[in-house]
Amino acid sequence: MSTASDARFWDRTSRKYAAAAISDQAGYERSLERTRALLGPADRVLELGCGTGTTALQLAGGVQSYLATDISAEMIAIAEEKHAAGPVPALVFRTATAEALDGQFDAVLVFNYLHLVRDLPGTLNRIHALLAADGLFISKTPCLGDMNPLIRLALLPAMRAIGKAPYVSAFRAAELSQSISAAGFEILATESHATKGKDARPYIVARKR
């Protein structure tokens, strides 16, 4: 599968994705509150992989500007529907990837995104370039390498082979941290926000060096 086929996958599943409940609502709320505390009213924020815009709509009211992007045009269409129902002046949705963007941002947010990119080092380097000096890079990422090996070794490859899953990387949390540091970031905090079961989704706050 290519990035174009990844986009088609998310286009096909966008309505089902939008209707699905958040598996750990309390953990999600914890991540939202932590992120709000890190952002200020003068901040220019970029969110990559925003999906149907749920997080963007929660956070955009507290910053100067908030650009929320996703590879899937159908996901962005749903996000725009939500935005029309409850407008937030600072918020703009756009179909785009990190590689297609320019400008400077004070914070880049990526939630449930980094395991889906095909070139993790390249994406991290691009995020670094998009950040202003001392800008914050805030992420929360499923680390499949720390999950049940049957998922990454059998189930996901089989689902990808028949078009039932997008591209997914199965790195460990330690490997993700190493990649973030190697891209020119200082990791300020690594936190666990889950309230159910084992947490394999580290919430990482990093600063551009």
Model-derived segments and their meaning:
Residues 109:
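A conserved beta-strand element that flanks and buttresses the S-adenosyl-L-methionine
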Residues 46-48, 52-99:
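Class I SAM-dependent methyltransferase SAM/SAH-binding core
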Residues 158-174:
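Acceptor-substrate binding/catalytic loop of class I
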Residues 112-113:
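Short catalytic micro-motifs in class I SAM-dependent methyltransferases
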Residues 121-133:
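A short glycine-rich, Lys/Arg-flanked "PGG" loop and its adjoining helix->strand segment in the class I
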Residues 183-185, 189-209:
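Core SAM-dependent methyltransferase catalytic element
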